[in-house]
Amino acid sequence: MTAEVSRSRAREPLSVSSGTVDGTWLGSDKVDTARLTAIPASNATVKTWVNGPDKNLIPIGFQPDHVTGDTGLAYSFSQCTWWAYTRRHQLGLPVGSHFGNGAQWADSARRLGYWVDSTPRHEGDVIVFQRGQYGSSPVYGHVGIVERINADGSIVTSECGAALAGHPVSRTFTAAQAATLQFIHY
């Protein structure tokens, strides 16, 4: 007795046997290319931004799931660094626990893989003021948080400091002033 193999008998074309020439992709004839090309990120907000408004802007080689450096709140109460850490957590954004003084934050974040540049992009971006910049400490610098980016490119901040007893204040910077600052995105 000879076994029949699949190539030994005639088959009907797919269009005849199934009534269609359309294939299926896991139960659907439509392939969601956006899902196939999406950049993975474990943080939901970061995932939305890297696959949405920032898709064509992120630096080459940027990895959204870089090490965050977050080991818990390590900043002294009411310091600018305490507020930046606390506010980022409130907004569900990554932030490191040991970035140093305000003026050191951009370099510390960059070393861990954060996207840092001089363009405010989203509510929650950390603003890094260099030593003495816009009234910041000439020794320590300063950090704040972007709360709003206005249509004209100006930004509204939330900031704290030791003398404020944990009560943040707000300032507005023009687009030209904002362009002189550094921003930690995610």
Language model segments and positions:
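Aromatic- and glycine-rich peptidoglycan recognition patches
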Residues: 147-186
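Intrinsically disordered, low-complexity
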Residues: 1-90, 94, 172-186
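Secreted/periplasmic proteins that engage bacterial cell-wall peptidoglycan
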Residues: 43-143, 148-150, 159
